[in-house]
Amino acid sequence: MDIFGIPIQAFMGQLMLGLVNGSFYAMLSLGLAVIFGLLGIVNFAHGALYMIGAYVAFVLLDKFGINYWFALVISPLVVGALGVVIERTLLKRLYKIDPIYGLLLTFGLALIAEGVFRYWFDVSGQSYPVPDLLQGATNLGFMVLPNYRAWVVFASLTVCLGTWYTIERTRLGAYLRAGTENPALVQAFGINVPVMVMLTYGAGAGLAALAGVLAAPVIQVTPLMGSNLIIVVFAVVVIGGMGSILGSILTGLGLGIVEGLTKVFYPEASSIVVFVIMAIVLMIRPAGLFGKEK
């Protein structure tokens, strides 16, 4: 059976690959949207935090024999703690000045992190094994679905929806949003706004690390893995609407699928389709699909 002249196995395979890539786009753009939407920082170090998260998982397994499931917890905590240190020592000094300084600082941090990890691990990729529980594939009849890729999609959707619900539908999320818009009022209720801001950045860094751990068995762990992805992720955030949590999730998943299907029908355009869509969206709706017009 063919779909538009393409064998269904090839079509569904690329669709699944697009959904997996979209899951990574969604998780990374989610962390960016959380940090920008709540703190107003354009975090160019996000790709580096993603890369560090993958390397933490690799080192835990290679040096200490700590498996994937523990790395899913430990790596986000380690990178989240690193994010807390970055926020307290560097970023907190920039909140009241032009946002361009935050962008330049985080861009510099990304270059430093990439250089350090290239020195420690070289540019050659490190392989990370798929955990035993998720090895193999399931035959669905019309396609063979790798179990690990199905897990990536499920885990990413769960984390994304959980984060969106926490920020948009809980009291904690209400405090976070209010703290960025009117810190003095929230402080009057006895809430420590600087600590809340610090933990928000740490949580965004942890989300990037979690995406890195999920990606490690799919792609090789390399110092360049973050810089190769971050431009696309920024495009996702811009298309979805800067600071829009739901917009980042839906746009990330949607663009991953579009990119995957483009590889089927017009492979030459697959590397630029996201940026073409971004240009079209910005011409029609400068605030993004889900962003608020100012």
Where are these regions (language model features)?
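Membrane-interfacial amphipathic/re-entrant helices at transmembrane-helix boundaries
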Residues: 1-27, 56, 67-71, 98-101, ...
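Single transmembrane alpha-helix segments in multi-pass membrane proteins
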Residues: 10-61, 89-96, 101, 237-245
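Transmembrane alpha-helical segments in multi-pass inner-membrane proteins
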Residues: 25, 29, 65-77, 198-208, ...
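Alpha-helical transmembrane segments within multi-pass membrane transporters and channels
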Residues: 65-109, 116, 250-255, 285-286
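Helix-loop-helix "hairpin" substructures at the membrane interface of multi-pass membrane proteins
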Residues: 21, 143-221, 245-251
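Cytosolic-side transmembrane-helix boundaries in multi-pass membrane proteins
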Residues: 10, 89, 120, 181-188, ...
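Transmembrane helix-bundle core of multi-pass membrane transporters
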Residues: 93-94, 98-169, 196, 220, ...
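Hydrophobic core segments of alpha-helical transmembrane domains in multi-pass membrane transport
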Residues: 54, 58, 76-82, 109-117, ...
